[in-house]
Structure formats: C-alpha cells, structure tokens
C-alpha cells in the first residue's frame, strides 16, 4: 500500500502543479517509485496515452518528472470547456458527453467509484502517490459534492499540504481564510503550509509565519514546512498561457501562432519557444501579425466558431496575403481543418451547418460523432515543397479530433501525402487520417499534436527558415529537447528541496492523517 501526500492551494495558479512535479522528481531522486494523481482536471491541453486514452497534460509532465509513463489512471476525469457554462466530460480517457456545469455538479458523485478504482490501482503499484487538488478547498458552495480537494483527501486518507501564492499578494489572508472556512475534520487533515513564489529575504517573512501560526492556533495547529522561492524553470504549465500570450517582440526567426478564442494544446509550440533567437508570438489581431517567417494555426475546441473569428477579425485575409508572399503556413488539428476547402457538421458536433475554409489545402472535413484518440509514430516520406528536408525524419505524436478529412479533389499522392504509415490511409475511400499534407509549396497541415517536439523535425523547420533569411543556423539552434526537459525537472527539484523541510514531509507521509 502506497504512502500519500496531497497538495492543495488557496486558489487557482497557487503553484500546485509545479510543486507536485517537484515532489515527484525529489521522491524519484530519493529512490522511490512515485506516481502523480489528480482526480479531476479542467484543461484544454490534453494528451493521448499509448493505449489511446485522453488525459490532462499536467499529469503527463508530473509523470515525466517521476520517470514513468503517463497513464489515464493518473487523471480519471478530464473536463474540456466547450462554452462558458459547459464542458466535454472525459472519464477514464473516453468521452462521456457534453454537460452544463449544473448538470455535471449533480452527476459527478456517480464518478467516485471510477476515481477510487484508478487511485487504488496506482496504490498497489507505487511506493508514494502525490495527489494534486484543484482551485481551493474552501469553495463553500461546491464542498458538498467535492471529489478533488478535501473530498479526495478523505477518499485517499491523504495528509494535505496547503500552498499559498505570495507573488499576487495577501498570502496570509489566503491561508488563514482557507483554513477558517474548512470544517474541523478537514483542518485536521492539513499537516503543513507552504508559501510559494517568494521573492526576497526569507528572514523578513519569518515574523509573519509565526504570527499566522499563532492566529490559527485556536482552531488548528499547522506548521509551515517551507517557503519556496520564485523559481524560473521552463516546464509546461496549464496556467502559464496568459504570460505566453504577452510576448510580442519579433526576433531573428519569427513565428506567429494565431491566438484562437478556443485554442487548445498550445503546448504543441513549447519546443519552438526554447531558442533565444526564435520568437513565438500569439496574435489575435491583424495589427499584431507583422511579417512572420511562419504562421501556425493551432488546435481548437471549436473549429467552426474559431474559423468565423478568423474571418470576422480580418486574420483570414491577412493569412492569405502572407501565403501569397510564400510565408510558411502550418495547421495542426483544427487549424489544419481550417486550411481546407469545406467543413461540414451534419451531426451538430460543433453546432451544425457548414462553412468554407481558407482553401489552401485540398481537403474537406466532416465532423463525426466519435472522437479519434491515438498515438502515432513513423517516418516522413517524400515531403514536397519548402519543407522537403523533412523527408526521412521520424515523427511521434498523438491525435485528438472529431473530424474526418478527405481529399477534396483528385490529388497526386506523392505531392500531398508526406507520411509513410500507409496503414493509416485509405486511398480507395479518399480518406485522410494521420497524414501531413502540403499544397506542394509552403502550406502544410497535420492532425498530429506534438510534431514539433521531435528534434529532427523542429531542427529542419528552423533551419529552413534560417536558410531563407540568410541567417547562420548555429546562431539560432543548438538544442537537445529531451535532455533540456530533464535538466529543468532537476533544477525545479533542487530549488524546492532546498526550501522545504523534506524530513518533516517524510514524517507527515509516514504518520498519515
């Protein structure tokens, strides 16, 4: 039976995910077999496991830090927002349907057996499970049916560490208010408090720690187990997208990602963001586009609505103008579908109807009732056009999409089909599943998420852009992505280990609740 520790926060973006990532790495370094767990995650960023199930990317990152393969057991419930008041509900990696917030609130208690099955399976396989909460445990309007904070802590019988974010101010009020709003039995489960994202001299903070403990003493005896400094590490974070959207400065190689209103899987571009002389700018206005070397249309949770946004905002016309000047255009998943000629929604998956695409690729898309979920790998074959240097490069990634794309007219296979996994295509029925296609010049599209994570592919694309501009490739690119990620996990672990009382945390895990 595994020991457990749970990280809960005073609010969203308090740093729970990164602290779980850090603890997974620290415990791995200390010789333990450790797994992350989050009963319910809400995110548009998702991942497909080897066995074809969909899960949140935060737990994928945490699994990487722990040195294990991600499993849907680590995130049994994933909510992917479709509107301001509704989400697609994914349970054990498979779609259960779309629900409004009120309907899901009534339904979620029925998912407790599935949550416990996942947790208990991990419990048998690992030494330690590091559990992540969501938002705040003190959302008193939601507590009655809680399955992700104190409700989960009770189910797992897990001691809790409560994290407050000092960077946004009011950390003592955050911590005091959260503890005060909890029930007595819930307070008893909190075994330590952590202040996160601190800048400055800890000695100046220490009187406040003592005063807060004194103020809490009538209702709870909870020690501080650490003050974690504001640490700059380059690790995927679900809540970091707003910071990424602020980047507007063009560099030697400039890549513009269209900031669609319902953008999903923006982690597809993480590898491209690594290089000091490459800018990845997220733009939502024509005035922000400038003259990039590459334009990427990303994935989206609603392709049709976001295509309408593209059209109404004037970005479609701007993209077509850039294409006429031979700018490299690349679409992923929903962005790939937009680059085609027509999109049809006969089953009302995205609201019904049909809409004309940008007509830059010879495909039509029909939205189906069933979602495609799978990993994919192979070798690129006979890539045409500007990125012909990708021929022979290996690829690996995953697909998550509702649409099925077909050739819109008779096309030359060698000109448009770049992937060599022939079992994934059915030319007799004119369908395309996981193929990278081009217009034979400088427009490309794929259903494959994670394609830029492959070092050979990323290197070739940046190298091609450098060559077009007469820039020395070595000035821009010198990088091993996998090694870099490992270094970042170690850097995070070092910073957190040195600032937490790990001896006390091991004692908390040993004693339990």
Swiss-Prot record:
**Record keywords: DNA repair included?**
no
List GO molecular-function terms, semicolon-separated: ABC-type vitamin B12 transporter activity; catalytic activity
Which part of the chain is the GATase cobBQ-type domain?
Answer: 252-457
InterPro entries xref list: Class_I_gatase-like, CobQ/CobB/MinD/ParA_Nub-bd_dom, CobQ_GATase1, CobQ_N, CobQ_synth, GATase_3, P-loop_NTPase
GO terms under biological process = cobalamin biosynthetic process
Does the UniProt entry include the keyword Metal-binding? Answer: no
Which residues are catalytic?
333, 449
Please name the pathway: Cofactor biosynthesis; adenosylcobalamin biosynthesis
UniProtKB keywords: Cobalamin biosynthesis, Glutamine amidotransferase
Family the entry assigns: Belongs to the CobB/CobQ family. CobQ subfamily.
Query: What job does this protein perform?
Result: Catalyzes amidations at positions B, D, E, and G on adenosylcobyrinic A,C-diamide. NH(2) groups are provided by glutamine, and one molecule of ATP is hydrogenolyzed for each amidation.
This chain's protein is named Cobyric acid synthase
Species, as recorded:
Lachnoclostridium phytofermentans (strain ATCC 700394 / DSM 18823 / ISDg) (Clostridium phytofermentans)
Question: What gene is it encoded by?
Answer: cobQ
């Amino acid at each position: 039976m595994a020991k457990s520790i749970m990280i809960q926060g005073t609010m969203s973006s308090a740093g729970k995910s990164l602290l779980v990532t850090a603890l997974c790495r620290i415990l791995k370094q200390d010789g333990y077999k450790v797994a992350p767990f989050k009963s319910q995650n809400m995110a548009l960023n998702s991942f497909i496991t080897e066995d074809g199930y969909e899960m949140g990317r935060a737990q994928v990152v945490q699994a990487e830090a722990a040195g294990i393969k991600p499993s849907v057991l680590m995130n049994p419930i994933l909510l992917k927002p479709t509107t301001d008041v509704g989400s697609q509900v994914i349970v054990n990696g498979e779609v259960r349907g779309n629900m409004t917030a009120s309907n899901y609130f009534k339904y979620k208690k029925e998912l407790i057996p599935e949550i416990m099955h996942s947790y208990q399976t991990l419990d048998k396989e690992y030494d330690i499970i590091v559990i992540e909460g969501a938002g705040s445990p003190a959302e008193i309007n939601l507590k009655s049916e809680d399955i992700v904070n104190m409700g989960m802590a009770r189910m797992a019988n897990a001691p809790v560490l409560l994290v407050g974010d000092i960077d946004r101010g009011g950390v003592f009020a955050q911590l005091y208010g959260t503890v005060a709003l909890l029930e007595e039995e819930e307070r008893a489960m909190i075994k330590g408090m952590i202040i996160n994202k601190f800048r400055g001299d800890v000695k100046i903070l220490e009187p406040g720690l003592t005063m807060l403990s004194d103020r809490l003493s009538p209702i709870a005896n909870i020690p501080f187990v650490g003050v974690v400094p504001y640490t700059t590490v380059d690790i995927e974070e679900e809540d970091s997208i707003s910071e990424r959207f602020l980047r507007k400065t063009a560099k030697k190689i400039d890549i513009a990602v269209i900031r669609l209103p319902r953008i999903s899987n923006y982690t597809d571009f993480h590898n491209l963001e690594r290089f000091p002389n490459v800018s990845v700018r997220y733009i939502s206005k024509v005035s922000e586009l400038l003259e990039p070397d590459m334009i990427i249309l990303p994935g989206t949770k609603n392709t049709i609505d976001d295509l309408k946004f593209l059209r109404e905002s004037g970005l479609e016309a701007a993209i077509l103008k850039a294409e006429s000047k031979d700018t490299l255009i690349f679409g992923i998943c929903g962005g790939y579908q937009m680059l085609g000629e027509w999109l049809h929604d006969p089953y009302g998956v995205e609201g019904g109807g049909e809409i004309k695409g940008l007509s830059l690729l010879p495909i039509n898309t029909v939205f189906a009732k069933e979602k495609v979920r799978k990993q994919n790998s192979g070798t690129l074959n006979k890539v045409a056009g500007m990125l012909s240097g990708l021929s022979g490069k290996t690829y690996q990634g995953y697909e998550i999409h509702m649409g099925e794309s077909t050739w819109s007219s008779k096309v030359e296979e060698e000109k448009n089909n770049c992937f060599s996994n022939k079992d994934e295509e059915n030319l007799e029925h004119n369908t395309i599943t996981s193929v990278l296609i081009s217009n034979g010049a400088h427009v490309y599209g794929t259903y494959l998420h994670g394609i830029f994570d492959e070092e050979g592919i990323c290197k070739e694309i940046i190298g091609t852009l450098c060559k077009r501009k007469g820039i020395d490739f070595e000035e821009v690119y010198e990088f091993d992505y996998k090694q870099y990620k490992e270094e970042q996990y170690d850097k995070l672990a070092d910073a957190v280990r040195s600032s937490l009382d790990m001896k006390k945390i091991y004692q908390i895990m040993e004693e339990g609740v």
